């Protein structure tokens, strides 16, 4: 969220390749996909190709904590009903406050229960074909001063991959948090820090990343893990983009292609840069291939976005898809949501409030009242117009992102939210079932 791992059974290609039997040779023609044509094809071992784009969901708030997804984990720290003083703002401070052993106990319980095998079966039954699984660097390595619980998450990731395989789902592994934080978001593990390009932090991040690439790019996993996102949402307007490219992205690509000779797909988040920014980086013309650009799209994280009329939101969503079509790389909308407000508790962070009702404040910035957030999580009190608009917004985004490689909605489930919970939205008949069902067709034409 604004918030980013061959070839044996069923692999994803992004080109019109004929006779695309799974092969083990390591060259550009055996890549899971390239991007010369705007088609996506699943190629089965029986050689029957089925046109199918990515229709995925994010498993947010599981192996990387996010307070708004599982507020119960953070509410246990509350000392008074009037403010959020003393409540950890992220996983770093959650672990720091509890101490290692108690944090491990609570996190292990959360990891064991928040997603189970039946969730993967349900996700597949609802027509999705991929899950994107965020994980932090601290799952694989830590710095000497880190309070994080480490070396436990990998078991749950591996089990998730097994479940995905069992139910015919593909997996993207997403390095969601870098040492020192790449964006200052709470979902990076450490809020209000932007230090991942410092030498020690970069070294730890690269250590975790090369481990992920080494393990999940082997033939044992390549039938199911069809992409590895090198880093989720690096904050391009703040960090040094050249250092990001030269010290993390390019070395990771070279390590994958030249050191371990794998054709695993690499996913690069757009770093909040404009369309076409990445056209000249790791592209087919330079004989560098198998790279997806991941765009994340939300319309609730500024006062301007929150005041848009519905027709304007739809128009902007449709334009996202149209703008991505002409990029050099294939792209996927790796995050987006149904949200029309920022009212979900702690969406903007513990202690920060919501812009929609004017309660948001950070440093010297304030928001102004647009409308009430009361009853935001009580669907019985949603006006019919809001339900219709939410469905309309979802459908427009799905149609827009079908113009390129597909989409991965954020996120599959939460404890309390409606706008950010695909599972609840399906139950409420707000998210379409089947996925191609449209109450509001042709919005992007």
Swiss-Prot record:
It holds the Pfam family Cellulase. SUPFAM superfamilies: (Trans)glycosidases. It is found in: Secreted. GO terms for biological process: ascospore formation; cell wall organization; glucan catabolic process. The keyword Hydrolase applies. Its EC number is 3.2.1.58. InterPro entries: Glyco_hydro_5, Glyco_hydro_5_CS, Glycoside_hydrolase_SF, Glycosyl_hydrolase_5. It is an enzyme of class 3 (hydrolase). Residues 1-21 form the signal peptide. GO terms for molecular function: glucan exo-1,3-beta-glucosidase activity. GO terms for cellular component: ascospore wall; extracellular region; fungal-type cell wall; fungal-type vacuole; prospore membrane. It comes from the Eukaryota. The active site is at residues 233, 335. Glycans are attached at residue 201. It catalyses: Successive hydrolysis of beta-D-glucose units from the non-reducing ends of (1->3)-beta-D-glucans, releasing alpha-glucose. Keywords: Cell wall biogenesis/degradation, Glycoprotein, Glycosidase, Hydrolase, Secreted, Signal, Sporulation. Probably involved in the processes of spore formation and contributes to ascospore thermoresistance by participating in the morphogenesis of ascospore walls. The enzyme may do this by modifying glucan linkages in the developing ascospore wall, thus strengthening it or lending it plasticity. Belongs to the glycosyl hydrolase 5 (cellulase A) family. This is Sporulation-specific glucan 1,3-beta-glucosidase.
């Amino acid at each position: 969220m604004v918030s980013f791992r061959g070839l044996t059974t069923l692999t994803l290609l992004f080109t019109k390749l004929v006779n695309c039997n799974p092969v083990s040779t390591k060259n550009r023609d055996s890549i899971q996909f390239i991007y010369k044509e705007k088609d996506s094809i699943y190629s089965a071992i029986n050689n029957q190709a089925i046109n199918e784009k990515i229709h995925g969901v994010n498993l947010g708030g599981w192996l990387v904590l996010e307070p708004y997804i599982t507020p119960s984990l953070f509410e246990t720290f509350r000392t008074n009903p009037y403010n959020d003083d003393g409540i950890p703002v992220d996983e770093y401070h959650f672990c720091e406050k509890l101490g290692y052993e108690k944090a491990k106990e609570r996190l292990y319980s959360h990891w064991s229960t928040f997603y189970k095998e039946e969730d993967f079966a349900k996700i597949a039954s609802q027509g999705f074909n991929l899950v994107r699984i965020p994980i932090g660097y601290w799952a694989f390595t830590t710095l000497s001063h880190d309070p994080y619980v480490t070396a436990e998450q990998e078991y749950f990731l591996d089990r998730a991959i097994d479940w995905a395989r069992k139910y015919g789902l593909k997996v993207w592994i997403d390095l969601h948090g870098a040492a020192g934080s790449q964006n200052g978001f709470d979902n990076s593990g450490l809020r209000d820090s932007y230090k991942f390009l410092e030498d020690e932090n970069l070294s730890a991040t690269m250590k975790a990343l090369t481990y992920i690439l080494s393990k999940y790019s082997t033939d044992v996993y390549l039938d199911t893990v069809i992409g590895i996102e090198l880093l989720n949402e690096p904050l391009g307007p703040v960090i040094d983009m050249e250092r990001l490219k030269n010290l993390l992205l390019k070395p990771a690509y070279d390590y994958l292609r030249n050191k371990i000779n794998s054709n695993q797909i690499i996913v690069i988040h757009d770093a909040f840069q404009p369309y076409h920014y990445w056209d000249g980086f790791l592209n087919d013309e330079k004989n560098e291939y198998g790279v997806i650009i991941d765009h994340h799209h939300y319309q609730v994280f500024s006062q301007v976005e929150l005041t848009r009329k519905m027709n304007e939101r739809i128009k902007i969503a449709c334009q996202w898809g149209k703008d991505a079509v002409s990029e050099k790389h294939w792209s996927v909308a790796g995050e987006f949501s149904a949200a029309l407000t920022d009212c979900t508790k702690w969406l903007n962070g513990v202690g920060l409030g919501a812009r929609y009702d004017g309660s948001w404040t950070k440093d010297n910035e304030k928001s102004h009242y647009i409308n009430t957030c009361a009853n935001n999580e009580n669907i019985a009190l949603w006006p019919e117009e809001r339900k219709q608009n939410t469905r309309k917004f979802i459908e427009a985004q799905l149609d827009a992102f079908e113009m390129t490689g597909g989409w991965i909605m954020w996120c599959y489930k939460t404890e309390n939210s409606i706008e950010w919970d695909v599972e609840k939205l399906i139950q409420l008949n707000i998210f379409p079932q089947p996925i191609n069902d449209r109450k509001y067709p042709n919005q992007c034409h």
